[in-house]
Amino acid sequence: PPKPKTPKKKEPKVEAKVPDAAKDSLKTKSVKPPEKKKEQEINPAIKALAKVIFSLKNVSFNWNETNGLLLPGFNRQSEWLGQNWDGSSAPGFAFTFGSQNQDIRERAAKNGWLTTDSTFNSQFTSTYTQNITGRATLEPFTGFNIDVNFNRNYSLSTTENYRAFNSPRANGRYYETLARVETGNFSISNLMWGTSFTKDRKDYSSTIFERFAENRRILSERLGNENPNSSGVGIDGYRDGYSGTSQEVVILSFLSAYSKKSASRMSLDLFPSIPLPNWTVRYDGLTKIAFVKNLFQSVNLNHGYRSTYNVNSFTTDVSYVPGGNARDINMDFIPKRQIGQVSLSEQFSPLIGIDITWKNRNNKSSGSKSATERGGRSSGGNFTTRFEYKRDRNISLTLAGIQVTEVKGREFTFGAGYRIPNFKFPFGLFKSVNSRRSNDLNTTLDFSVRKNTTILRKLVEGTNQPTAGLTIISIKLASDYTVSERLNLRFFFEKTINTPVVSTSYPNANTAVGITIRFTLSQ
C-alpha cells in the first residue's frame, strides 16, 4: 500500500530589522550619465550656402568664341590640303587649319605671297565674337522654382588697308598697315532694380538724372587718378583731361546713377567682364492650402526680371594715341574707342502674374450625373482667369549733345477663358461633318491698359521734356472651335483705343472683327 505523505513542516520566518541610520547608508546613489557634448553650431552663412547648393536642379554654362581672318592679295595657287606645293608651302598648315595668328600678314609679305601692286586696295579683315551664357534652375522648396540666367556678348571687327613690299622697309618689315579701324558692339546682363520704382516729379524732373549729373565729379576724380597724364583740377572742379562732358565720365556716371552703383567703388571699365543675374520665378504650391484647393484646380504665381546694358556700336578713334596723352578740342583725353550711344533696358515681365484655373461647381445635387457618367469626358476646370502687371524701361544716352531719352511703360492685363466641353452648334450645323464626335468651344477675353511715356532730358541745358506717349486700351475676344481634324473655325473681335500724352498728337481707335476658317489639306 502507498505510504501516506507526511506534511512539510513550515520553516519559521526570520526578519532582521535594520536601523534607519543603516538604511540611509545602504541607499545607492544615482549616477548621472555623462553629459553629451553640445554639437558645434554651423555658421549661418555656410548653412545658407549649403541650402542653395542642394536646391540646384540644373546648371549650364556656355562660352563660345569665333575667330576669322581674311587676307586678300594672296598670289599663290592653293592645291590639296589648301597648300601650294611649288616649294613655298603657302599659306602654311597653321593657317589652313584655323590659326588666328595675325603675324601671317608679315610672313606672307616677306615670302612674296602677297601682291605688291600699288593700286590694290582690298582690306585685311579679322573678326572676333564672344558669347557667354549661363543658366541655373533652383527649387528651394516644392513648387517654388527659380530660373537664373546671365549673358555677355562681345563682337569686334578689324579692317585695314595694307601695302606689301618685295624688300624690307626702314623698320625691317615687308608689310605696312595704312589705315586700321576697329568696330564692334557689346551687351551684358545687368541689374537696375535699385531705381526701378523711383518716380518722376510732377514737372517730369528726376532724382536719378540729378544723381547722374552729380556723379560726374566723383568719376572724373577717379579717372584722373588712374591716368598719370592728368595734372590738377580745372576751374570747373573736374580733373584735367576729364571734364563733365568727357565720354568716359558721362557714360560711367550714367551707369552709376541708373543702375544705382556707387560712383566711388564701381568699375571704370566701359565693357564689364562679369554679367549680373536675371531671373524668372514660378510658384504653384498655393493649392496645398485647404480653402484654396477647394476653390481652384491650380494657382500659378509668376515673376520675371530682365535687364541689359548695350553699347550699340563703337569704333576706333583715329586720333587716339597709345598712352592716353592725345586731347580733343575740349582738352579732354581722346579715348581709344569712340562710342556714339549706350542704353539700359529693363523688363518686369511680369512684375506679378497670377494664373488661376477654377474648379467646376456644376451638378452638385446627388441625383445628377457627372460628365463621365453621362458618356462624356471629364473636363477639369472650364473657367480660367489671369492677371499681369508689367513694367519696362528703355533708357538711352546719346553722347552727341549729351541727352538721355527715357521710355517707360506700365501695363495691366486681365484675362479670362471659358471652355464648353462637347459643344454642338444649334440647328444641326456641322452635324454631317462632325457626326462622330463633339469638340470643345474655347473662348478667351483679354482686357489691357498700357501707358507709355517718352521723356527727353538734356544734361547741359538741364531740361526735362515729354516728347511722346500713349495710353492704350485694348479689348480682345476670341472663340476657337475644331469642327474636324481638318477644319478649324475662329471668331475674333479686337478694339484698341490710343490716347496721346502730348497735345501734338490725336487720339485714335481701331476695331477688327472677323472669322477665320482654316482647312488643312494634308494631315
Protein language model regions, located:
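Exposed, low-structure sequence patches enriched in small/polar residues
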Residues: 1-523
